[in-house]
A protein has these predicted regions:
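Entry/capping segment at the start of metal-dependent catalytic domains
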Residues: 1-78
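Flexible, polar/acidic helix-loop-strand segments at domain edges
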Residues: 39, 141-188
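Short helices/loops that flank or line small-molecule/ion binding pockets
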Residues: 116-119, 137-143
Length: 188
């Protein structure tokens, strides 16, 4: 579902607002030496997906990444696996500087964030997609909203604020208003 949202969003944004393609020089990408010869990574394309806390249209250095997802695409079958990296995970950001992993994007933009993922997780990421809050709202609207399906037995554990969310659909504006908050007040 997330990959579908990102693909639809990238298409929508490219058609409606324009996409800025930023190339990172190959020599600026850091990978562990063992990664190049790792047979397990052959036939896969790994892409970093960043959701940044940018209320304006700036998507580069200076914005913390609220969401970090690695999309691993099997080039033979087309299967996609997504792995979320918790933003508060304490990792080496480079030069033996340890911090929450979302600080890598703030300190050095997508280049440092990709290098942080490659170094700590033994990956070969060279490509990325970044979406800010405005882009997120546009993506959600473009696909007709997002349905959040939380089961009754899960609600009690979600900040103890929710009453019911089963089948609730929000448009981009409402989702945008609640994204990044510590809790979401929901009514039936």
């Amino acid at each position: 579902v997330l990959l579908l949202v990102l693909i639809a969003g990238a298409w929508f944004i490219s058609r409606g607002t324009g996409v800025t393609k930023i190339n990172i020089k190959e020599e600026d990408i850091v990978m562990n030496e063992t990664v190049a010869n790792n047979e397990a990574l052959k036939g896969y394309r790994n892409i970093a997906l960043f959701g940044v806390d940018a209320r304006d249209k700036s998507l580069g250095k200076g914005n913390r990444s609220d969401t970090i997802i690695i999309a691993s695409i099997n080039e033979d079958t087309g299967d996609v696996k997504l792995c979320s990296v918790y933003r508060d995970t304490y990792l080496n950001l480079g030069n033996d500087s340890y911090n929450k992993c979302n600080a890598a994007y703030a300190k050095g933009g997508p280049e440092q964030a990709i290098n942080m993922l490659n170094m700590n997780l033994d990956l070969n990421i060279t490509d990325y997609v970044t979406v800010g809050f405005t882009g997120l709202r546009e993506v959600i609207d473009a696909i007709g909203g997002v349905t959040i399906d939380v089961q009754e037995n899960e609600i009690v554990h979600l900040n103890n604020y929710q009453i019911s969310m089963v089948g609730k659909t929000d448009d981009g504006e409402n989702y945008y208003a609640t994204e990044g908050k510590d809790y979401i007040a929901v009514t039936s």
